[in-house]
Design a protein with these regions (language model features):
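RNA-binding basic/glycine-rich loop and surface signature characteristic of RAMP-family CRISPR effectors
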Residues: 1-143
Length: 143
């Protein structure tokens, strides 16, 4: 269906909260989570909407924006946009370190999922073998 595929890594410089749109008590939008893993995620539709909004706020031509992203919901025009966004998944997150500052934490499952996604896109080559990490343990890597 689509002619080209690409992976995009998003890096948040401030706290991000993608709400699931379901109210629970005081929290009006619980964090979006994948149904099958329970891991936090960003729905592709939310990312697409944010990118569309950025194009619009930068003064992008409305016709080009509609061709790229599709018409606004509720529009009389009904056609799909030229781009599609998949859901974003967490690869690593900053965690406060006892030695000062923050470190990036991840897990073998998150790394393996990223490897599979990049391999599907034809971008992954010769990944090193992931070391085994025992339950309740951690492994430090210095880059």
């Amino acid at each position: 269906m689509f002619e080209q595929k690409a992976a995009v890594f998003l890096y948040a410089v401030s706290p991000v909260h993608m709400g699931a749109g379901q109210a629970i008590g005081v929290i009006d939008h619980p964090i979006q989570r994948e149904r099958h893993t329970g891991h936090p995620c960003f729905a592709g539709s939310g990312i697409k909407g944010a990118v569309r909004h950025s194009f619009k706020s930068l003064g992008g031509d409305e016709n080009h924006i509609n061709r790229l992203f599709g018409p606004e919901s509720g529009s009389a025009e009904l056609h799909a946009g030229a781009v599609s966004f998949g859901d974003a998944q967490i690869v690593a997150l900053p965690v406060r370190s006892l030695k000062g500052g923050f470190v990036y934490a991840t897990c073998p499952q998150a790394i393996a999922r990223t490897q599979r996604l990049l391999a599907h896109l034809g971008l992954a080559r010769n990944w090193p073998t992931l070391p085994e990490v025992a339950q309740g343990s951690c492994l430090t890597v210095h880059a």
